[in-house]
From Swiss-Prot:
Recorded catalytic activity of this chain's protein: N-acetyl-L-glutamate + ATP = N-acetyl-L-glutamyl 5-phosphate + ADP
Listed PANTHER family: N-ACETYLGLUTAMATE SYNTHASE, N-ACETYLGLUTAMATE SYNTHASE, MITOCHONDRIAL
Protein name: Acetylglutamate kinase
The protein's annotated pathway: Amino-acid biosynthesis; L-arginine biosynthesis; N(2)-acetyl-L-ornithine from L-glutamate: step 2/4
Residues where substrate binds: 64-65, 86, 190
UniProt GO molecular function: acetylglutamate kinase activity; ATP binding
Family statement: Belongs to the acetylglutamate kinase family. ArgB subfamily.
Localization per Swiss-Prot or TrEMBL: Cytoplasm
Job description of the protein: Catalyzes the ATP-dependent phosphorylation of N-acetyl-L-glutamate.
């Protein structure tokens, strides 16, 4: 058990970071195992509430892949992914929107409010927050040819209107956002939550983007637990993707970090959401954790 002196030392260590990030917007992409394990849910959302109480402006963009997959199984539909993105036909899109907006989003809002924060749930369709066009994914065949794959109602964000989020922040609430966008004809699009978080972070002029995932960060060699890449420069990314060091679902996470950096976000981080209070460890301690992706 920590002594009072050890607890005081922790607070003293955090003070410079509380001052540094006071009044700053920090976008958190909430996903992975941290959305499934009840104690981790509590830890992540408690972190967000604490951040708000010390003067920061946390914004949560959540995923929901496992719960979507489970719901699709219930109705007898298989899940298929291309380049880390879910192939989404019309029926699947209805289920995606139902799960993300109707179930997960409201559950997060309810828990934050119970912990002691004040949260407001939004989807990308509210006030035209995320406007999108159909996205096509480039894939490489076993023969090495590059082809374009049709992945259905998966959208690419064409415009972000952050005013509704800024208004919610200004009124003292924590925005919680489901990554569903609206198309030119009013159709719904499934947006990868990593991309949504990156684009929103840039549009808000956020100081930091944090992406929670189910690994320690980006590993140079996944068979070697000691090969964590603590700092990754943008110029190194294409080579790591080509070599397969960055692949699958990690590709959109890294790409969204690069997009956010290009849009003016100061720092981006990929953290292990399985570690309790990983967000606080990154923000309020000298060492930090995970992989920082920088220009």
């Amino acid at each position: 058990m920590s002594t009072p002196w050890e607890k005081a030392a922790v607070l003293v260590e955090a003070l410079p970071y509380i001052k540094k990030f006071y009044g700053k917007t920090i976008v958190i992409k909430y996903g992975g195992h941290a959305m499934l394990d009840d104690s981790l849910k509590e830890a992540v959302l408690t972190d967000a509430v604490l951040m708000k109480y010390v003067g920061m402006h946390p914004v949560i963009v959540h995923g929901g892949g496992p719960e979507i997959t489970e719901m699709l199984k219930r109705v007898g539909k298989d899940s298929r992914f291309v380049g880390g993105l879910r192939v989404t036909d019309g029926e699947t899109m209805e289920i995606v929107e139902m799960v993300l907006v109707g179930k997960i989003n409201k559950g997060i809002v309810s828990r934050i409010n119970r912990i002691g924060g004040l949260a407001v749930g939004l989807s990308g369709k509210d006030a035209g927050l995320f406007q999108a066009v159909k996205k096509y994914r480039k894939v490489r065949t076993p023969e090495g040819r590059e082809e374009t794959a049709d992945i259905g109602f998966v959208g690419e964000i064409s415009r972000v209107n952050p005013q509704i989020v800024s208004t919610v922040i200004a009124e003292g609430y924590i925005p919680v956002i489901a990554p569903v966008a609206v198309g030119p004809e009013g159709e719904s699009y499934n947006i990868n939550a990593d991309y949504a978080a990156g684009r929103l972070a840039a549009a808000l002029g956020a100081d930091k983007l944090i992406i929670l995932t189910d690994v320690e960060g980006i590993m140079a060699d996944r068979s070697d637990p000691g090969s964590l890449i603590s700092v990754l420069r943008a110029s190194e990314v294409p080579s790591l993707i080509e070599r397969g060091v960055i692949d699958g679902g990690m590709i959109p996470k890294v790409e969204c970090c690069l997009d956010a950096l290009a849009g003016g976000v100061r720092t981006t981080h990929i953290l292990d959401g399985r570690v309790p209070h990983s967000i606080l460890l990154e923000i309020f301690t000298d060492k930090g954790i995970g992989t920082m992706v920088e220009k």
